[in-house]
A protein has these predicted regions:
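C-terminal transactivation domains of fungal Zn(2)-Cys(6)
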Residues: 236-295, 309, 349, 353-357
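Aromatic (Trp/Tyr) and acidic
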Residues: 1-19, 23-40, 49-52, 81-143, ...
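Long, well-ordered core segments of solenoidal/helical folds
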Residues: 65-86, 90, 177-196, 259-278, ...
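Surface-exposed intrinsically disordered loops and tails
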Residues: 282, 286-288, 387-388, 488-493
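Short coil/linker segments at helix-helix boundaries
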Residues: 151-183, 215-221, 239-259
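Hydrophobic or amphipathic alpha-helical targeting/insertion segments
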Residues: 45-71
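Surface-exposed helix-capping loop/turn segments at secondary-structure junctions
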Residues: 155-162, 193-198, 243-251, 272-282, ...
């Protein structure tokens, strides 16, 4: 059934009427008072293109699976981010390129040197995904991404098992989604030193320009082993060992290898519980100076909580369970790369055996966290959305860490309670990033009639046919950290929800990252699976 929605942008309403492409019959109309477009004969509408007319013309398609292709492309974005292998047809789907950054000759930075691997030791750390708009690879961000990735799979196994991505591994007897994830997991495992610690990132000393990856000439380093990075690897591999267990015939030995590596990492972190990445201080002590993304995090309690949780769910060793419960923070905080506690809490909600009371307390905290946003959506929101109703909603990466993640929280709440109120509000969050916002942009490249054309994304820059499709960009940012840099100039006197530029140098509003894209596909897939 076609639902009625108000055709308005929050400031004024419009007079619309809709036509079917089949026979030009009027299917519905809206008045200039903010009315709803309702079909005259809803039972007769079927999947086909339709057109809305006002001063201009806009076309749309009625589809029984409106989010299917969006989900597919949001997942395929990770394939486009692959390092060390060529992106070739037929998998490239119009965006072929040679391999970039083989990373088989990576140097150990002085900050990461040990007796066994002294400074400038050469190691191989090939594979994985480019992290964002740059050409580097960061463990803390990758770990969070893999957590959301694999937890989404666990929630909708049957759905993902039938989702075809058209990637080189599509012929393997394993879901395409898991095959894509494995490409990054294998790289993450190469970032573990022989003592169990994990390098914080693999990077050039400073950012490359907007050039083709094959043109990059700067040396690449693995940098300082840190507690958060090590625990993120421990959690990721423990989770992966559990998820990939049915596919031992495809990845022989992986489960045992991942389990051992996860335990080794956790023990290293317990022996080194407070080694954090402080880039300015590091650069005072070691050369060359590193000025790429810091992903600095000065509290590892949340990472200990997540790693111990995943190790318990894998091994059922009560030692890990007891340690996990001890690490659980008192305050409920939405998950980001820098605070992964909610990932652990969600796992306990979904696997409550032996900790029923604790799981119920965590679930109550989730629902209490969502309650004011949902009430606002239902009573005091221009777009009837649980996101985007106050200036503080618009920050660096808000489309993901604010909007899409809130939608994912709503999906988990729906799964846990069966209350459709949460499902409705998850969709409202997606509506925001797809265009129901103050800018009018669909914030996903390649989708909609008004989407970003100049993302801060080096890979997209190499294609004359426009940006790579399926990438969520960061979105409006009231802090405008890039204002006045490299030609970035924001209009004066615009509100926080309009502080956005579709301009390549605008890294504060127009960049892409793997951790943002994982929330886009997890949200769209969760909604598509309900169709």
């Amino acid at each position: 059934m076609l639902r009625g929605y108000p055709f308005r942008n929050g400031r004024y309403s419009m007079d619309w009427h809709g036509f079917s492409h089949d026979d030009q019959s009027i299917i519905g109309q809206a008045t200039p008072t903010g009315g709803f477009l309702y079909p005259h004969h809803p039972w007769s509408l079927h999947p086909t293109p339709y057109t809305l007319h006002r001063d201009a013309v806009a076309s749309f398609t009625i589809s029984p699976r409106p989010y299917r292709e969006l989900t597919r492309q949001a997942l395929r974005a990770f394939y486009y981010q692959r390092t060390a292998m060529p992106i070739i047809e037929p998998y490239a789907e119009g965006y072929a390129r040679p391999a970039g950054h083989p990373d088989t000759l990576v140097l150990v930075h002085a900050s990461a040197a040990t007796a066994e691997r002294p400074e400038n030791t050469i190691i191989s750390s090939s594979g994985g995904w480019y992290d964002a708009g740059d050409y580097n690879k960061y463990i803390v961000n990758s770990g969070y991404t893999m957590g959301v990735f694999l937890m989404a799979y666990e929630q909708q196994r049957a759905y993902y098992d039938t989702l075809h991505l058209n990637i080189p591994e599509s012929t393997l007897p394993v879901p395409d989604m898991l095959a894509e994830a494995m490409y990054n997991i294998r790289w993450m495992m190469t970032m573990q030193d022989t003592d169990g610690g994990v390098y914080h990132k693999l990077t050039e000393p400073d950012f490359e320009g907007f050039i083709h990856p094959t043109e990059c000439q700067k040396p690449r380093y693995v940098v300082l082993k840190t507690t958060p990075a090590t625990l993120d690897l421990a959690a990721t591999l423990a989770l992966a060992a559990r998820i990939y267990a049915p596919y031992e015939h495809v990845y022989p030995g992986f489960v045992a290898e991942a389990t051992e590596a996860a335990k080794h990492a956790y023990e290293w972190a317990k022996a080194n519980p407070a080694i954090y990445y402080d880039q300015p201080t590091m650069n005072e002590q070691f050369t060359p100076a590193i000025t790429t993304g810091a992903y600095d995090d000065y509290d590892a309690q949340d990472e200990f909580y997540w790693a111990a949780t995943e190790l318990y769910l894998l091994t059922h060793d009560p030692i890990y369970r007891n340690e996990a419960l001890g690490y659980c923070p008192a305050q409920f905080t939405p998950a980001t790369w820098g605070n992964v506690a909610e990932l652990a809490s969600l796992e306990w909600m979904l696997h409550p055996a032996s900790v029923e009371a604790f799981a119920q307390e965590r679930q109550a905290a989730l629902l209490a966290h969502l309650q004011p946003y949902i009430e606002e959506a239902e009573t005091n929101s221009v777009h009837r959305s649980p996101y985007g109703n106050r200036a503080e909603d618009f920050f660096w990466g808000c489309n993901s860490e604010g909007c899409c993640w809130r939608g994912i929280e709503c999906l988990y709440a729906y799964h846990l309670t069966g209350n459709e109120r949460y499902l409705i509000n998850a969709e409202r969050c997606l509506n925001h990033v797809l265009g129901q916002n103050a800018t009018g942009y669909c914030f996903v490249t390649g989708f909609g009639t008004h989407s970003p054309k100049q993302p801060h994304h080096r890979l997209s820059n190499i294609y004359p046919n426009g940006p790579l499709p399926g990438f969520l960009i960061g979105g409006p940012n009231r802090e405008r950290q890039d204002d006045g840099i490299d030609g970035v100039t924001y209009p004066k006197n615009v509100s926080a929800d309009e502080s956005y530029l579709d301009f390549r140098p605008s890294y504060a509003t127009n960049e892409v990252t793997i951790n943002w894209n994982v929330t886009l596909f997890a949200l769209t897939a969760g909604l598509d699976a309900q169709q």
